């Protein structure tokens, strides 16, 4: 069936093609390397023109002859070029930003009316310049903290890099770093993300309307594009903050042929120790609210949380580093090789010595092998690992993947963009071992698992006429659980295995699944200023991140689909209205969505650690439902820029063996959230920014009380996620200053000073409820918060 669909895509596109020769290429920002979507290419003699797509690519069809091209984009200096066209040619353009014009234009890197005319719905695009307008956290511009401010996206807890998209779990978010999958995105237990802003040129978040070329997750895709090295001149930057120091280098190893980009960060332990002295902790408190949809009673959150507990991860015995690299080799005007890599590692003394980290690499060959055709071949490696030594015991776990992807892009004319391809990924899961270091064979070993996830896909972004644009795509995914390993049948009551079948070879298929995933989006242009959009997506997910605690931690494990754990299928419907005012200076949007989940997973009650022989038996699946409404008002241009967003959403699960088979709030359900962002560019070198966040507290499961046996307390529960943490809110303020006198004194070296005030009014947002034994041996609730007021400063030098 998929072959027929691909043939149909190609047939439709070919029938729409036109005769003539082509001028094609890519238009980018010369400084940042960011692809410029919506840049104009105009031929002055024939008055024919076109604009670039979201990846900065253009295609112009003309007969043989001499032509004069004018390449322009708002906020950039234009380029005039004369060409003689007697064959299909490729010309890439690099536009230089106009510093004066850039102050008053949208710095997103896309056309100002892209939100109106494109087929994208439930999609957010940000350039690194937009990200840098947000107040920094501990001296670091943070990609993950920034996307948590977007409509429909919230954080899982204070300071965490994990994020929730429309009520779904964080494992339902596919995170890509230049095409490399990332399985854990945090440093320092969530204070920092693994994305170094100096190494990022832009990002795209798909909350819905996910293109068919992406797959494997049910909720969203975060596609982060890493920075390319400058192919003409050397650039270097260094910076230092209270906690971290970092550097970046751009080097044209062979001018216009071979470039290198390298960036690194590391903790400065003395800075961490200093900050620990600034914040000595305060009382925590708050009220726990019963989730009215589930019944229950309120309760007070009592007790204190010490500064030492709150901020101990700043102690000098915790550190991290990461390195980003990218090498681009331009073989000729039609081919290039791209090598990207990432290495990151955390180490800490918490309960013994702990370390975790990511390693990833990608090799991509891009080839414009024929008229209107582009080929991308990628080989990708990614690994996440964690280990802990506590006393005489050693625990380790992780996941690693190796994949290959072949994609073809076909541009028959300016109204169609066709892509189709194939991808295959081998997955190796280490579910953990607990070893006794004093014994040769002592310990507990969890059997590893292996899987192969593959897919065929095809898609077309089709402008039908001046009013209607249609995106349509299909993805056919396959999953095979591979040997060696045991395939068990479990007793439904005890979860003990009652039958086992052993598969000895790596090529043995223990279980198989396939899913057909249609994707469609429609844009109807009501006028040049407003449009109506709708979309439908089906996404299959074969991996799940299983967590025992209320928060996602570095030691949580990824579980593949097996005979006993079915894949999750998510069907999402979205409808939106988009309106731009005053020549695209103000953008208003409103979207509503409805998601149906089949195969939603959660752990059964009674599991207290991962080191059990039959872990998959405790994974229960059922159905889920998420729906909501998002609205946003944005001003992306001018000296004052900002955004106001409000989200309403519900997310509930229903699993037969949990909560007596009744619907219950999913642990990442946050009913209301509000974000306000603002940036004042007071002068060309001085700006002030602020963010305010509010969200409903997330659901938690708490004991109703305790019963005592032989003087020992045993808790008892009634219902899953019956209560809620107190609501979350926070105000941050940032100041950015680039002294011009320093630039003059230092001969052109640019210095930027970032000052950030995190949590200005010192709100102690509770993220976890603990129980301590109080008076009369009774247990009391203690709300634990992490961060209070945190000032920080960072100095960056570019030369």
Predicted regions and their residues:
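Short, acidic, small-residue-rich periplasmic hinge/interaction motif at the N-terminus
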Residues: 28, 39-44, 72-76, 86-140, ...
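Periplasmic N-terminal accessory/gating domains of Gram-negative outer-membrane beta-barrel systems
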Residues: 108-171, 177-210, 227
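Surface-exposed extracellular loop regions of Gram-negative outer-membrane beta-barrel proteins
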Residues: 385, 428-437, 442, 480-500, ...
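Signature of Gram-negative outer-membrane beta-barrel scaffolds
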Residues: 424-529, 542, 658-661
């Amino acid at each position: 069936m998929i072959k027929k669909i691909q043939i149909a895509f190609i047939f439709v596109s070919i029938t729409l093609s036109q005769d003539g020769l082509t001028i094609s290429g890519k238009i980018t920002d010369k400084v940042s390397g960011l692809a410029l979507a919506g840049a104009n290419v105009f031929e002055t003699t024939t008055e024919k023109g076109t604009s670039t797509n979201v990846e900065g690519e253009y295609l112009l069809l003309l007969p043989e002859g001499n032509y004069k091209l004018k390449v322009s984009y708002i906020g950039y200096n234009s380029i005039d070029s004369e060409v003689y066209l007697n064959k299909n040619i490729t010309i890439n353009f690099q536009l230089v930003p106009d510093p004066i014009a850039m102050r008053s234009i949208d710095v997103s890197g896309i056309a100002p009316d892209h939100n109106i005319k494109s087929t994208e719905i439930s999609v957010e695009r940000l350039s690194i310049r937009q990200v840098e307008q947000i107040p920094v956290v501990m001296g670091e511009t943070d990609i993950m903290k920034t996307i948590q401010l977007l409509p429909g996206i919230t954080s899982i807890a204070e300071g965490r890099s994990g994020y929730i998209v429309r009520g779904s779990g964080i494992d339902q978010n596919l995170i890509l770093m230049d095409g490399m999958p990332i399985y854990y995105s945090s440093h320092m237990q969530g204070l920092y993300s693994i994305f170094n802003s100096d190494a990022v040129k832009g990002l795209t978040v798909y909350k819905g309307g996910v293109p068919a070329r992406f797959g494997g997750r049910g909720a969203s895709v975060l596609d982060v594009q890493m920075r390319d090295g400058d192919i003409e001149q050397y650039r270097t930057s260094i910076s230092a903050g209270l906690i971290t120091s970092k550097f970046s280098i751009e080097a044209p190893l062979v001018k216009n042929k071979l470039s290198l980009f390298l960036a690194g960060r590391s903790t400065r332990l003395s800075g961490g120790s200093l900050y620990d002295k600034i914040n000595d902790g305060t009382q925590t408190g708050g009220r726990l609210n019963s989730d009215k949809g589930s019944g229950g009673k309120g309760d007070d959150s009592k007790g204190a949380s010490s500064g030492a507990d709150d901020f101990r991860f700043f102690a000098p015995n915790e550190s991290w580093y990461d390195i980003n690299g990218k090498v681009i080799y331009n073989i000729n005007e039609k081919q290039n090789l791209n090598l990207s890599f990432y290495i990151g590692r955390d180490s800490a003394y918490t309960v013994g010595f702990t370390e975790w980290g990511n390693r990833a690499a990608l090799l991509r060959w891009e080839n414009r092998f024929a008229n209107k055709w582009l080929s991308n071949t990628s080989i990708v490696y990614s690994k996440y690992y964690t280990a802990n030594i506590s006393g005489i015991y050693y625990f380790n776990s992780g996941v690693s993947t190796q994949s290959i992807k072949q994609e073809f892009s076909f541009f028959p004319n300016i109204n169609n963009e066709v892509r189709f391809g194939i991808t295959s990924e081998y997955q190796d899961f280490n579910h953990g071992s607990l070893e006794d270091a004093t014994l040769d064979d002592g310990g507990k070993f969890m059997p590893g698992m292996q899987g192969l996830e593959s897919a065929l896909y095809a898609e077309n972004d089709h402008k039908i006429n001046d009013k209607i644009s249609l995106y349509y795509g299909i993805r056919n995914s396959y999953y095979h659980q591979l040997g060696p390993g045991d395939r068990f049948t479990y007793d439904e009551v005890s979860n003990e295995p009652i039958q086992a079948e052993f598969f000895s070879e790596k090529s043995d298929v223990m279980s198989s699944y396939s899913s057909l995933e249609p994707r469609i989006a429609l844009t109807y242009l009501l006028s040049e200023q407003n449009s109506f959009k709708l979309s439908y997506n089906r996404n299959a997910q074969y991996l799940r991140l299983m967590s025992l605690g209320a928060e996602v931690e570095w030691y949580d494990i990824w579980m593949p689909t097996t005979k006993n754990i079915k894949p999750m299928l998510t069907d999402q419907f979205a409808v939106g209205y988009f309106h731009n005012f005053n020549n695209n200076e103000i953008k208003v949007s409103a979207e509503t969505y409805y998601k149906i989940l089949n195969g939603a997973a959660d752990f059964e009650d009674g599991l207290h650690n991962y080191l059990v022989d039959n872990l998959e038996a405790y994974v229960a699946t059922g159905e889920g439902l998420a729906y909501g409404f998002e609205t946003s008002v944005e001003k992306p241009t001018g000296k004052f820029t900002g955004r106001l967003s409000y989200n309403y959403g519900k997310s509930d699960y229903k699993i037969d063996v949990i909560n007596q088979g009744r619907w219950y709030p999913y642990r990442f359900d946050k009913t209301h959230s509000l974000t306000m962002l603002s940036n004042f560019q007071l002068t060309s070198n001085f700006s002030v920014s602020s963010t305010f966040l509010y969200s409903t507290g997330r659901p938690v499961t708490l004991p109703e009380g305790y019963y005592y046996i032989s003087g020992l307390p045993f808790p008892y529960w009634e219902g899953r996620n019956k209560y809620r943490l107190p609501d979350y809110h926070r105000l941050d303020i940032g100041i950015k200053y680039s002294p011009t006198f320093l630039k003059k004194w230092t001969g052109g070296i640019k210095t930027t000073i970032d000052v950030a005030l995190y949590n200005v009014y010192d709100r102690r947002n509770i993220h976890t409820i603990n129980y301590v034994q109080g008076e009369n041996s009774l247990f009391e609730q203690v709300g634990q918060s992490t961060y209070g007021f945190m000032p920080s400063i960072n100095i960056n030098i570019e030369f």
